Amino acid sequence: MSLTTASRVFADHPSVRPATRDRVLAAADDLGYVVNALAQAMMGLGRRTVAFVAAHMIGSTFADMAAGAESVATAEGNLFLLSTTGEDPARERDLMETLREYRPAAVLLAGSTQTGEEFEQRAVAYAEALAAVGARLVLVGHPACPGSKSILSVDYDQVGGVRRAVEHLVTGGHRRIAFLGLIPERTTPAERLRGYELGLQDAGLPVDPSLVIECANDSDGARVAALSLLSRPDRPTALVCLTDGVAVGVYRAARSLGLAIPGDVAIVGFDDAPIVADLTPALTTIRVPFWEVGVHGARVALGLEEYDGHVQLPTELIVRESSP
């Protein structure tokens, strides 16, 4: 029997007769032979890989996106690969080059949160390099690249979510509303800050720069920033937090200052992460469909859904006990 015939058997070629296929597979089993799936994938045969590349896997955000993407990738018979960059552009570039060499079916890039021309140029280069080997790049959890309409992206409505949160607080009687968690040159804070500003403008309220507070995106950094903010004589009566993790820090600060939630200060988070289940009073927050972002991202990347450019999924304001 020729090597060509054996290769056709392992590639599941329709020209091979059933009896021949059975003999080859039986011989392979006796010899303990294992098919080189990577080599098959690189030749466009067998199972291919869908790669999910994230900045990190801390918290539920990227984990939920990855789970959604994996559900689609595996249902379509693909292998699913997960890797992280640590928000290092050099690591990101090296990883994308390695993935290109392995000829994946698709790559989903999540959490590359930088903005600006330099990132868009990188994304275009990634997309072109992957397209040359038959793969598609999709940004997930990232807003549209205005200067590069050819870059596909699947995101969620961050601006609208925060805008609705501010409207909710204004309706509850609040006028001094702070935004806590600004991190420069990142898409997520930039989008959420824009929603905050638009919400104030909708209500005819000025944007007070002294109420836009930068802090680390964790409960410890938020607690320190909130202690200073809430100790002011003219302290805000409500805070919109960049994330639920930031909101946890604000809870700690308010309690240490003897402030009641929401009587003295109302608090709104963002994400509806699992950590909010432990907060008392229950946190008002903006629910994000992270799993669905991953699902749609994978479907677009694999050509199961066709979208022209950018897909944006809705967010939902979940009103609980920490706001009026």
Regions found by a protein language model. Name each.
Residues I151-V154, A225-P324:
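Flexible loop/turn connectors
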Residues A55-D64, L82-R91, T113-E118, H142-A144, ...:
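Hinge/beta->alpha junction and helix N-cap segments in small-molecule ligand-binding domains
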Residues M1-R48, P324:
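N-terminal helix-turn-helix DNA-binding module of bacterial transcription factors
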Residues A75-E76, V133, Q201-V207, R232-R235, ...:
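Short helix-capping segments at alpha-helix termini
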Residues S2, R48, A105, H174-R176, ...:
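Short acidic/polar active-site loop segments enriched in Thr and Asp
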Residues L45-E167:
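Alpha-helical recognition/docking segments in bacterial nutrient-uptake
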Residues R175-R176, V207-L211, I261-A266:
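Short acidic capping loops at alpha-helix termini that bridge into adjacent secondary structure
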